C-alpha cells in the first residue's frame, strides 16, 4: 500500500513541475478543476484523514467528513479545500503535498495490521454504514485520486498546449 501510494503520489505531483504559476488557476473547458484545485483537493482529503486520526487520539468523537459538511454536500467541502489553499503558489502546494504524503505514510506505518485491515480499526472509520477498514479510507482518499487526477492534469496540460 505504501509503495503504491508513493508511486502514485510521485507520478501525480511531477506533472505540476512544468506548469507556470500564472496558470495555476486557469480552467480549461474539458477539465473540471484548475491545477491548484487538483492539489488542494488532495491536500484537503489527506489532512482530513490526519485530523480524524488526531481527534480520535485526543478522545474526540469524529464526524466524517466534517461537522460542517455531510456526505451529500461534498461540493461545499471541496470548495472549502480550494479556498483554504487559494493563496498558495504552485511551488508551495507541491511542497505541502509532498510533506503531507509523508505524514500519511507515517500514519499508515504506525498502524498494526489489525487496525489497518480489519473493520473497526478506528472510530472515524466506522462513522459510515459501510464500516470500511482504515486502509480503504486511506486508499480511496489518496492512491485512487492521485491516479485519477494525474489523468486530469495531463488532459489539462494537453488542452493548454503544454
Language model regions located:
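Solvent-exposed interaction patches of small proteins and small membrane subunits
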Residues: 1-7, 59-62, 88, 92, ...
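Short, contiguous alpha-helical
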Residues: 28-76, 119-162
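Alpha-helical packing segments of well-folded alpha/beta enzyme cores
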Residues: 8-12, 45, 49, 89, ...
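Short, contiguous, pocket-lining structural segments
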Residues: 1-8, 30, 96, 141, ...
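Residues that form generic nucleotide/phosphate-binding pockets
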Residues: 4, 15, 56, 84, ...
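Long, hydrophobic N-terminal alpha-helical segment
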Residues: 6-44
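Acidic/histidine-rich alpha-helical segments that form the ligand environment
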Residues: 73-117
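Charged/polar positions within long, soluble alpha-helices
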Residues: 14-17, 21, 47, 51-54, ...
Amino acid at each position: 500500500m505504501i509503495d503504491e501510494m508513493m508511486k502514485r503520489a510521485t507520478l501525480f505531483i511531477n506533472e505540476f513541475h512544468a506548469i507556470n504559476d500564472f496558470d495555476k488557476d486557469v480552467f480549461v473547458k474539458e477539465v473540471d478543476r484548475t491545477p491548484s484545485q487538483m492539489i488542494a483537493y488532495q491536500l484537503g482529503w489527506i489532512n482530513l484523514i490526519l485530523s480524524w486520526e488526531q481527534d480520535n487520539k485526543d478522545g474526540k468523537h469524529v464526524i466524517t467528513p466534517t461537522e460542517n459538511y455531510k456526505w451529500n454536500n461534498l461540493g461545499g467541502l471541496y470548495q472549502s479545500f480550494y479556498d483554504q489553499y487559494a493563496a498558495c503558489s504552485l511551488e508551495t502546494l507541491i511542497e505541502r503535498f509532498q510533506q503531507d504524503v509523508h505524514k500519511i505514510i507515517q500514519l499508515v506505518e504506525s498502524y498494526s495490521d489489525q487496525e489497518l485491515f480489519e473493520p473497526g480499526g478506528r472510530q472515524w472509520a466506522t462513522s459510515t454504514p459501510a464500516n470500511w477498514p482504515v486502509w480503504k479510507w486511506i486508499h480511496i482518499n489518496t492512491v485512487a485520486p492521485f491516479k485519477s487526477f494525474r489523468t486530469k492534469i495531463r488532459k489539462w496540460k494537453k488542452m493548454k498546449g503544454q
